[in-house]
């Protein structure tokens, strides 16, 4: 992981000038209610693009293109870019800005009410690249990870603390970590300071990449069982697994103890200490012994 963005100060003025010109030309303002912080650092854009590893044949879905700084770079590299924007005030500006790009398509919609199948119109491989508004980060990740038509990879800008939770290791993992790791392999690309955006957010951000393979370590595990057990395990975090699962699942302690012993897990441990392999064992034990 790269810890800083050395090109931030040098590259910001050019993109900042472009952002101000576009905002003045279309009488635009960053809408706090939509969590808008427009990216103005070429150095940060370069890191996103390097992580995305785009090819001329790739299809990209971008959530919340904003003023189009990232969109423009994506269009230079990918075969098709489909941007989904909720803010009606940005639609005309984006349509005009990218009218010369035949590989650009803009959808005016709420991403949380639009499935990948509806966006793409067909079953094709795609990648998700986005500077996500903080307030919909978890919902967007969940939507695409749980979708029938999942992306090959996701490169997203999120709040730094959320990024730390996503990439946490065994011992520090929470429900968000498990939710992401059930479907893919997350990694932290770079921490991004507030000055990379206009207006700057009050907290730092981070670029996270999630690769979604054809098969994962959780292959063969019921999605329903996994999340049922995980939510129960983390429902009362300070409790031991024995107590948390018994309370969360509404099952007697002797039965839970039998499940944990069958999976080779000490009942005195806590949910955050389990590895993905141990969660898999527990899920398979649970599936094989319906309570």
From Swiss-Prot:
Cell membrane among keywords: no
Coiled coil: none
One Pfam family it belongs to: RrnaAD
Main location: cytoplasm
PROSITE patterns on file: RRNA_A_DIMETH (PS01131), SAM_RNA_A_N6_MT (PS51689)
Catalytic activity line of the entry: adenosine(1518)/adenosine(1519) in 16S rRNA + 4 S-adenosyl-L-methionine = N(6)-dimethyladenosine(1518)/N(6)-dimethyladenosine(1519) in 16S rRNA + 4 S-adenosyl-L-homocysteine + 4 H(+)
Record EC number: 2.1.1.182
TM ranges: none
EC class name: transferase
Signal peptide annotation: none
Keywords associated with the record: Cytoplasm, Methyltransferase, RNA-binding, rRNA processing, S-adenosyl-L-methionine, Transferase
GO molecular function, one term: 16S rRNA (adenine(1518)-N(6)/adenine(1519)-N(6))-dimethyltransferase activity
Binding site for S-adenosyl-L-methionine: 37, 39, 64, 85, 110, 131
Compartment annotation: Cytoplasm
Keyword Iron: no
Gene Ontology cellular-component annotations: cytosol
InterPro entries xrefs: KsgA/Erm, rRNA_Ade_diMease-like_C, rRNA_Ade_Mease_Trfase_CS, rRNA_Ade_methylase_Trfase_N, rRNA_adenine_dimethylase, SAM-dependent_MTases_sf
Function: Specifically dimethylates two adjacent adenosines (A1518 and A1519) in the loop of a conserved hairpin near the 3'-end of 16S rRNA in the 30S particle. May play a critical role in biogenesis of 30S subunits.
Family named by the database record: Belongs to the class I-like SAM-binding methyltransferase superfamily. rRNA adenine N(6)-methyltransferase family. RsmA subfamily.
The name this protein goes by in its record: Ribosomal RNA small subunit methyltransferase A
Provenance organism: Dehalococcoides mccartyi (strain CBDB1)
């Amino acid at each position: 992981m790269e810890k800083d963005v050395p090109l931030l100060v040098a590259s910001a003025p050019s993109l900042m000038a472009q952002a101000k010109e576009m905002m003045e030309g279309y009488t635009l303002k960053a809408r706090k209610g939509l969590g808008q912080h427009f990216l103005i650092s070429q150095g940060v854009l370069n890191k996103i693009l390097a992580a995305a590893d785009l090819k001329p044949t790739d299809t990209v879905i971008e959530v919340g293109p904003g003023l189009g700084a990232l969109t423009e770079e994506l269009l230079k590299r990918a075969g098709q870019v489909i941007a989904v924007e909720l803010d009606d005030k940005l639609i005309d500006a984006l349509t005009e800005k990218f009218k010369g790009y035949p590989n650009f398509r803009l959808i005016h919609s709420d991403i949380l009410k639009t499935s990948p199948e509806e966006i793409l119109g067909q079953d094709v491989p795609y990648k998700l690249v986005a500077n996500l508004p903080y307030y919909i980060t978890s919902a967007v990740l969940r939507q695409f990870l749980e979708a029938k038509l999942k992306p090959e990879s996701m490169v997203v800008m999120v709040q730094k603390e959320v990024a730390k939770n996503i990439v946490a290791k065994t011992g520090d993992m929470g429900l968000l970590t498990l939710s992401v790791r059930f479907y893919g392999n997350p990694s932290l690309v770079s921490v991004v300071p507030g000055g990379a955006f206009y207006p700057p957010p009050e907290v730092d951000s981070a670029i996270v990449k999630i690769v979604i393979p054809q098969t994962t370590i959780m292959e063969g595990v019921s999605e329903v069982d996994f999340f049922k057990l995980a939510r129960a395990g983390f429902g009362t975090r300070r409790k031991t697994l024995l107590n948390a699962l018994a309370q969360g699942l509404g099952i007697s302690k002797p039965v839970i103890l039998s499940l944990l012993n069958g999976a080779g897990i000490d009942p005195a441990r806590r949910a955050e200490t389990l590895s993905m392999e141990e969660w898999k064992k527990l899920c398979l034990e649970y599936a094989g012994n319906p309570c």
